[in-house]
Amino acid sequence: LYHANFELFNIYIFPGGFIGVDIFFVITGFLITTILLEEYNNNQSINILNFYERRVRRLIPALLVIILLGTILSYIVLDPTKLKHFSESVFASLGFIANIYFHYFGNIYGTETALMKPLLHLWSLGVEEQFYIILPIGLLIVLKYFNRFSYLLLALVFTLSLSFAYYASSKHVMFNFWMLPSRAWEVLAGSIVAFYLIKYKITSNEI
């Protein structure tokens, strides 16, 4: 609806569409960090392979359905050149690097050219999947060897990412939009909340 640019009296009816992705990243950080922290508190460890398996079982079926539908529609409406680019985006999406592919392909999200790419919206899933790969490993190392400073280290990485995003917002705008380093602070905002709630044993009834 946001990208349709509906207007009423020269006022966009659905403004601020991109903020939905930002909120999605924060919620993702909160939920995944909560799951990992609870597992560590219960077992004094995190089964990383089991975590990866659960993520694959949760995400891949829906991803394959989207790719299948996109493939059918693409063969109907796209010309050979665009179809070649679509095929490349399929492999990038399956390899969890859709955001990287679309960044270096050089398109601006929401433009007319970009709208001819059926899988473009999977860029955010690429960021999410990269976060899934990195977080359990980093969190396990921090909790095992730097537990006293875990909250501080998390806040430090959050600050570094936010600072980089601020710098890149004027110097490297496209990188800032597509890539994990400048998106990590959004995910880590949710992680920080999860750390706080679990550390101080705050239940949902107390919030």
What does each model-identified segment do?
Residues L1-I207:
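Membrane-interface helix/loop caps of multi-pass membrane proteins
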